[in-house]
Regions:
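Glycine-rich phosphate/ribose-binding loops and adjacent secondary-structure elements
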Residues: 1-127
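C-terminal extensions of enzymes
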Residues: 131-234
């Protein structure tokens, strides 16, 4: 989707529409063996940018404490979990590594019914080769060790609980001589800030917040007060 579509959904909730329980942000990095290569390689928004934008939009609208955010898209390691929780996710969804633990060889036949490992098929002649007992042990081991690694990373950051992670815990090298914290690259919007006259740190919100209403997904459907600001009306 587009930034203005997210804003429209959030604005509709601030105007009395029912609140969502959670929003799942699925980045372009994710994929499926059933998708065409062009879709897997080129469609979607990068997860980091999308996650930060959704977090900032909900926070600026005063809804962040009431709506959870899930992040997904090529989550493989404990660091992926910690990084995206620090950037704004309440939890992450992982699929790829669990499929690998089951024995996926990325044959890209998921939609055909002819998965050679028996994972993505309903054909009894194929799925009977899947040893449930041994694969269950592999999945359990991966899950337990990943959570252990998450705990170690959180401890190394000097905090006791993953909920205390924030953008300051992520450091990114931009060049050979420039290193910035994630909160410098992706400034956080303050609670309810979108309803004040304070400058909006997120450039996408600054551009689209007053151009979008909760009545439409269009990018140029300004609310009356925004139109007044543009025309000098009262």
């Amino acid at each position: 989707g587009h930034p203005w579509e997210v804003i429209a959904i959030v604005k509709s909730m601030t105007e009395g529409e029912p609140l969502l329980d959670f929003i799942s942000v699925d980045g372009a990095e994710g994929g499926t063996g059933a998708a065409p290569t062009e879709f897997s390689d080129h469609l979607g928004s990068p997860l980091t940018d999308a996650l930060v934008f959704v977090d900032n939009t909900l926070r600026g609208a005063g809804l962040r404490s009431r709506i959870k955010i899930a992040a997904s898209g090529k989550m493989v390691s404990a660091f992926d979990i910690v990084k995206h929780c620090a950037l704004g996710a309440d939890w992450v969804n992982m699929a790829r590594p669990f499929m690998f633990a089951l024995g996926c060889i990325q044959a890209r036949n998921c939609a055909s019914g002819f998965c050679p490992t028996g994972i993505a098929t309903m054909d009894p002649t194929r799925y009977r080769v899947l040893d449930i007992e041994s694969k269950a042990s592999r999945v359990r081991n991966f899950h337990q060790n990943t959570l252990k690694a998450v705990g170690e990373l959180v401890g190394a950051a000097g905090i006791a609980n993953p909920v205390d992670l924030n953008r300051r815990h992520i450091v990114r090298r931009l060049s050979g001589s420039e290193i910035l914290l994630a909160d410098q690259i992706y400034p956080k919007v303050l609670d309810n800030q979108l309803f004040t006259d304070e400058p909006i740190a997120d450039p996408r919100l600054a551009v689209y917040w007053h151009r979008v209403s909760g009545r439409s997904f269009a990018a140029d459907d300004p609310q009356p007060e925004a139109a007044d600001l543009q025309t000098g009306g009262t």
